[in-house]
Curated annotation (Swiss-Prot):
Family: Belongs to the binding-protein-dependent transport system permease family. FecCD subfamily.
Subunit field text: The complex is composed of two ATP-binding proteins (BtuD), two transmembrane proteins (BtuC) and a solute-binding protein (BtuF).
Keywords (A to Z) from UniProt: Cell inner membrane, Cell membrane, Membrane, Transmembrane, Transmembrane helix, Transport
Annotated signal sequence range: none
Biological processes per GO annotation: cobalamin transport
Functional description taken from the UniProt entry: Part of the ABC transporter complex BtuCDF involved in vitamin B12 import. Involved in the translocation of the substrate across the membrane.
Organism: Klebsiella pneumoniae subsp. pneumoniae (strain ATCC 700721 / MGH 78578)
Entry protein name: Vitamin B12 import system permease protein BtuC
Cellular component per GO, a single term: plasma membrane
Length: 331
């Protein structure tokens, strides 16, 4: 009994160290993100005339958007991996990201380039929620988790086909907008998108408080049901929360991959399996990772900015291949 208490105490201390380290990492990347750019502006100059423009009007809204989207994508990945008992699950697996893409592309094509940014954001959220509610219709039939997963994959393929057709028939101007969205980027984010950032906050906070049901889900469907967890209810709530977070993220920055896949899995490999620690750790690590990718996207080229989706794919693809090989070796 004493050894078990000692082990629990050591595990608690280790978790606190991880959370402290991730908090420190987030603060450092946040500071660098605000300072870095075509001109390096140290904190001492943030209140100057130059700082008022570059920091408070340009870099701060972008940095906040990157932080929130990174946290949302990593949290969505943690939810998917617990819900589907699959370490390779990620936010786009259920087709929700592609659904948001279809909504945004439909707005671009039908709006003829005259729709304001907030309308495009609403269309992306609507597309994500539409796919989410279709999935909930499947869930009402009490499908198994694996069948619900396959239904999401099928919906994602359909949405991907629709996006391909849209690109094929689009004009040159619309095509540039669509290709920029497909590669992901925060270049157009300013304070006008503040409402989208605020829309993420309540769902992020709610998901972070759901460690107990997620811990039960991680035990497997049978064990969770035996312990009294209403699977159908929590499956619906978590799918809707994921749909909302992914939809708002796509509306802010377009398609960004690998954050939701890699971050939760790496943290689990580091021993953070308890969702009481994993969820806040995912938020901070996801935000830090996407902030780092955004800094690279801004500074890699002197005359242009790389799409952040390209950066995350370049850095995340080798890790994804390693995860595939590792999971195959375990299987």
């Amino acid at each position: 009994m004493e050894s078990m208490l000692t082990l629990a105490h050591l595990q608690q201390r280790r978790s606190r160290r991880w959370l402290f380290g991730l908090t420190l990492l987030l603060l450092v990347t946040l500071l660098i993100s605000l300072c870095a750019g075509e001109q390096w502006i140290p904190p001492g100059e943030w209140l100057s005339a130059k700082g008022q423009l570059f920091i408070w009007q340009i870099r701060l809204p972008r940095t906040l958007a990157v932080l929130l989207v990174g946290a949302a994508l990593a949290l969505s990945g943690a939810i998917m991996q617990a819900l589907f008992e699959n370490p390779l699950a990620e936010p786009g697996l259920l087709g929700i990201s592609n659904g948001a893409g279809v909504g945004l592309i439909a707005a671009v094509l039908l709006g003829k380039g005259v729709l304001p940014g907030w309308a495009l954001g609403l269309c992306a959220i609507f597309g994500a929620l539409l796919i989410t509610f279709i999935l909930l219709r499947f869930a009402r039939r009490h499908l198994s988790t694996s069948r619900l997963l396959l239904a999401g994959v099928a919906l994602g393929i359909i949405c991907s086909a629709l996006m391909t057709w849209a690109v094929y028939f689009s004009t040159s101007f619309d095509l540039r907008q669509l290709m920029y969205w497909m590669m992901g980027g925060f270049g157009g984010v300013d304070w006008q998108q503040l409402w989208l950032m605020i829309a993420l906050l309540p769902v992020l906070c709610w998901v972070c408080l759901q460690s107990q049901p997620l811990n039960l889900l991680a035990l497997g469907e049978v064990s969770a049901r035996q312990l009294g967890l209403p699977l159908w209810l929590w499956r619906k709530l978590l799918v809707v929360a994921t749909g909302w977070m992914v939809g708002v993220s796509v509306a802010l920055a377009g398609a960004i991959g690998f954050i939701g896949l890699v971050i939760p899995h790496i943290l689990r490999l580091c021993g953070l399996s308890d969702h009481r620690v994993l969820l806040p750790a995912c938020m901070m690590a996801g935000a830090s990772a996407l902030l780092g990718a955004d800094i690279i996207a801004r500074l890699a080229l002197s005359a242009a900015e790389l799409p952040i989706g390209v950066v995350t794919a370049t850095l995340g693809a080798p890790v994804f291949i390693w995860l595939l090989l590792r999971s195959r070796g375990r299987g």
